């Protein structure tokens, strides 16, 4: 417990046939940008299994497209670790860093930008290549929401006001789990775009919210021991215990039930996609893109997350404590002068 907690995920597990190559080469990109500099940091990074995660999120991708997915996963977790210590308890410092990173969405960064920002700039440049302006605007909007969520979490820690209810927590955690940018990249990796007029439809929006919720619930179970070791109070298990007075086991069982119910709803929504195509009068190519979005983006981010969480070395207490009080081995967020 907790990585061995079982969830019934009624979706097939998949993995890119190019995983072994991508796994062997995964350190090249973060090292080239100064995001990993020491052997200790490299060893810690490899324990996370981020190439494995990307190969499950993007099983249709190979070569440079899969490499982009691996690099995004590497970046996500290097970025997230920067907020595990004092910075993540200081809203002003958090906003300073998230603003420095988000600036890459608007244009070239100054040389003084921190390494983690230059890493994101490279990811964004490669992600937006070949995608329509409408898609880039949608993805940028998702990224800004992701960054804003970190400031909200820092406010909670700064004022020592852990979330009192599951609903309050979900409203913020849905942003910082990073699922929407992850799903967006599936389109780029597969060289397709879901029809833009369908993206905000009720059915697709509900499917995506379930994907987000399942991911964050799986993550909170897997990361429970790590977060307990670090003194984190904002985890769904802890919140349910505070809100309802439940035991840890009952809180975990409730989350298992929530995931099961959400995935039952998800399958019903999936069955409505042909009718969505009819309502929006999609042509054959657009229907194919919608089916690919279901198969290669939403399904894979749900099932891939589960398979990876059960094996990743990221979520044990030793991984958390090895980095010390600041939560990371190398400072990647400092602005140079």
Swiss-Prot record:
<feature type="binding site">
    <location>
        <position position="219"/>
    </location>
    <ligand>
        <name>Mg(2+) 3</name>
    </ligand>
</feature>
<feature type="binding site">
    <location>
        <position position="80"/>
    </location>
    <ligand>
        <name>Mg(2+) 2</name>
    </ligand>
</feature>
<dbReference type="InterPro" id="IPR008949">
    <property type="entry name" value="Isoprenoid_synthase_dom_sf"/>
</dbReference>
<comment type="subunit">
    <text>Monomer.</text>
</comment>
<keyword id="KW-0456">Lyase</keyword>
<keyword id="KW-0460">Magnesium</keyword>
<feature type="binding site">
    <location>
        <position position="80"/>
    </location>
    <ligand>
        <name>Mg(2+) 1</name>
    </ligand>
</feature>
<feature type="binding site">
    <location>
        <position position="227"/>
    </location>
    <ligand>
        <name>Mg(2+) 3</name>
    </ligand>
</feature>
<feature type="binding site">
    <location>
        <position position="223"/>
    </location>
    <ligand>
        <name>Mg(2+) 3</name>
    </ligand>
</feature>
<feature type="binding site">
    <location>
        <position position="84"/>
    </location>
    <ligand>
        <name>Mg(2+) 2</name>
    </ligand>
</feature>
<keyword id="KW-0045">Antibiotic biosynthesis</keyword>
<comment type="pathway">
    <text>Antibiotic biosynthesis; pentalenolactone biosynthesis.</text>
</comment>
<dbReference type="GO" id="GO:0017000">
    <property type="term" value="P:antibiotic biosynthetic process"/>
</dbReference>
<comment type="pathway">
    <text>Sesquiterpene biosynthesis; pentalenene biosynthesis; pentalenene from farnesyl diphosphate: step 1/1.</text>
</comment>
<comment type="similarity">
    <text>Belongs to the terpene synthase family.</text>
</comment>
<protein>
    <recommendedName>
        <fullName>Pentalenene synthase</fullName>
        <ecNumber>4.2.3.7</ecNumber>
    </recommendedName>
</protein>
<comment type="function">
    <text>Catalyzes the cyclization of farnesyl diphosphate (FPP) to the tricyclic sesquiterpene pentalenene, which is the hydrocarbon precursor of the pentalenolactone family of antibiotics produced by a variety of Streptomyces species.</text>
</comment>
<dbReference type="GO" id="GO:0046872">
    <property type="term" value="F:metal ion binding"/>
</dbReference>
<dbReference type="GO" id="GO:0050467">
    <property type="term" value="F:pentalenene synthase activity"/>
</dbReference>
<feature type="short sequence motif" description="DDXXD motif">
    <location>
        <begin position="80"/>
        <end position="84"/>
    </location>
</feature>
<dbReference type="InterPro" id="IPR054969">
    <property type="entry name" value="PentlnSyn"/>
</dbReference>
<dbReference type="InterPro" id="IPR034686">
    <property type="entry name" value="Terpene_cyclase-like_2"/>
</dbReference>
<keyword id="KW-0479">Metal-binding</keyword>
<dbReference type="Pfam" id="PF19086">
    <property type="entry name" value="Terpene_syn_C_2"/>
</dbReference>
<feature type="binding site">
    <location>
        <position position="84"/>
    </location>
    <ligand>
        <name>Mg(2+) 1</name>
    </ligand>
</feature>
């Amino acid at each position: 417990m907790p990585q061995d907690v079982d969830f019934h995920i009624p979706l097939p597990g998949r993995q890119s046939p190019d995983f072994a190559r991508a796994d062997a080469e995964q350190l090249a990109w973060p090292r080239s940008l100064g995001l990993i500099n020491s052997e200790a940091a490299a060893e810690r990074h490899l324990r996370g299994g981020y190439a494995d995660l990307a190969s499950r999120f993007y099983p249709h991708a190979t070569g440079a497209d899969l490499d982009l997915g691996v690099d995004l996963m590497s970046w996500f977790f290097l970025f997230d670790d920067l907020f595990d210590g004092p910075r993540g308890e200081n809203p002003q410092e958090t906003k300073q860093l998230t603003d420095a990173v988000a600036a890459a969405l608007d244009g070239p960064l100054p040389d003084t930008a921190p390494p983690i920002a230059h890493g994101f700039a490279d990811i964004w440049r490669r992600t937006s290549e070949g995608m329509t302006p409408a898609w880039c605007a949608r993805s940028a909007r998702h990224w800004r929401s992701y960054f804003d969520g970190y400031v909200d979490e820092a406010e909670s820690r700064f004022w020592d006001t852990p979330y009192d209810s599951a609903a309050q927590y979900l409203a913020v955690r849905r942003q910082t789990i990073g699922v929407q940018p992850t799903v967006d990249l599936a389109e780029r990796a597969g060289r397709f775009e879901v029809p833009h007029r369908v993206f905000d439809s009720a059915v697709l929006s509900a499917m995506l919210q379930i994907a987000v919720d399942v991911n964050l619930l799986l993550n909170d179970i897997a990361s429970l021991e790590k977060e307990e070791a670090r003194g984190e109070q904002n985890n769904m298990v802890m919140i349910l215990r505070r809100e309802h007075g439940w035991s840890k086991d009952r809180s975990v069982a409730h989350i298992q039930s929530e995931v099961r119910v959400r995935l039952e709803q998800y399958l019903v929504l999936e069955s409505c996609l042909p009718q969505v195509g009819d309502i929006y009068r999609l042509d054959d190519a657009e229907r194919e893109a919608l089916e690919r979005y279901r198969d290669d983006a939403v399904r894979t981010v749900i099932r891939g997350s589960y398979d990876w969480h059960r094996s990743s070395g990221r979520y044990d207490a030793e991984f958390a404590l090895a980095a010390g009080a600041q939560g990371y081995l190398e400072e990647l967020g400092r602005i140079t002068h």
